[in-house]
Amino acid sequence: RTPYRVWVSEIMLQQTQVSTVIGYFQRFMDSFPDVHALAAADADQVLHLWTGLGYYARARNLHKAARQLVDEYGGDFPDTVEEVATLPGIGRSTAGAILAQSRGVRAPILDGNVKRLLSRLHAVPGWPGKKPVENRLWELAEQYTPDRRLADYTQAVMDLGATLCTRRRPDCPACPVANWCQARAD
């Protein structure tokens, strides 16, 4: 799990199902096997390979960030969430996911699926887009983030929110944390 491969997959998976991303990811990696290849590519080449995934700002930001990584870091990913989050199209959660999965850095994540999971698990009132609610969710995400097996935890918590704790019709009987879920208890 290199930072580059994790980064590209995380960006592709934003607002897009895994089943859709798989083929695109492989074609992208075949054309741009590393950050240097992506940075050297023409923007039109990048957008062409993105055709069908939608949300083209993701592809443009990916390309810009690749160039920034090569120009400022020699093609290496920075070591801190704060530095990674300065790259175009990467926020705190995506930066955390990249570093946790590729380098084992202890960094909480809070994508849409994790927000939903934590909101339900702790019956956090309010809309997650409001700053006080988001701050509370970050606190919870920080508390749950373990000290070991960061890649496994990060993938598991995202998958739990994406597959069981879904927006519509969550599968509570199959959920491993259902016994502690305050939303289910209500």
Regions found by a protein language model. Name each.
Residues 1-185:
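Catalytic cores of DNA base-excision repair glycosylases
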